[in-house]
């Protein structure tokens, strides 16, 4: 199985059919630089009349491999997440699944001029709003912890200074109208946060509403 080479810079990926293109998100940090034994999932940005559609192509996907999700950055989360839920369920429910196989989002590191990947195998998506302890990423760089407005560079310090009396789980939530590009950038921020406060856990559940 061929692998993605980190030397290749791809701001757009091309499918095998119809010369469709996908505009990838861009970021300045690489989480994972290379994924082997993979197969691709494509989610294209498609317009039909006045409607935007998430057009999924998983014809070349093999359940036993790592899946790389190549998703157009222009798509809103409200269209992307339902497709992710269906694809995760299909892979998880397959009799041929490989417990060691993971799922990754692809994006472009525009500083190093390389491809990069963000693992999300353990993420479980929920369409709805968490009741407590919620980090919320909204439009126009809005960031809140519960009702407290924050700057993104304040988030790690705020979490680690929370006053807690027992083990607490923090849930991450996103505005359903965020672009996939914004989502990936915010996911990278969350990935970089180091929790030093004993008893605080970041949940694998991600809410979209």
What are these regions (language model features)?
Residues 1-4:
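Positively charged n-region of N-terminal signal peptides that target proteins for export
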Residues 12-15:
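C-terminal motif of bacterial Sec signal peptides marking the signal peptidase cleavage site
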Residues 17-209:
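Long, low-hydrophobicity, acidic/polar, solvent-exposed interaction domains
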């Amino acid at each position: 199985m061929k692998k993605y080479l980190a030397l290749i810079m791809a701001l757009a990926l091309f499918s095998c059919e119809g010369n469709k293109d996908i505009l990838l998100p861009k970021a300045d940090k690489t989480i994972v630089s290379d994924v082997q034994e993979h197969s691709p999932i494509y989610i294209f940005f498609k317009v039909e009349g006045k409607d935007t559609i998430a057009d999924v192509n998983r014809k070349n996907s093999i359940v036993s491999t790592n899946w790389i999700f190549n998703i157009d950055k222009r798509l809103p989360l409200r269209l992307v997440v339902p497709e992710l839920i269906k694809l995760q369920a299909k892979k998880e429910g397959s009799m041929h699944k490989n417990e060691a196989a993971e799922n990754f989002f692809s994006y472009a590191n525009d500083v190093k001029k390389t491809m990069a990947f963000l693992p999300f195998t353990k993420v479980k998506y929920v369409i709805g709003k968490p009741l407590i302890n919620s980090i919320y990423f909204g439009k126009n760089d809005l960031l809140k912890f519960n009702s407290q407005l924050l700057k993104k560079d304040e988030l790690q310090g705020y979490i680690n200074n929370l006053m807690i009396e027992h083990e607490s789980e923090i849930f991450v939530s996103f505005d359903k109208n965020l672009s996939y590009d914004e989502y990936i950038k915010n996911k990278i921020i969350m990935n970089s946060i180091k929790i030093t406060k004993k008893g605080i856990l970041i949940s694998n559940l991600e809410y979209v509403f």
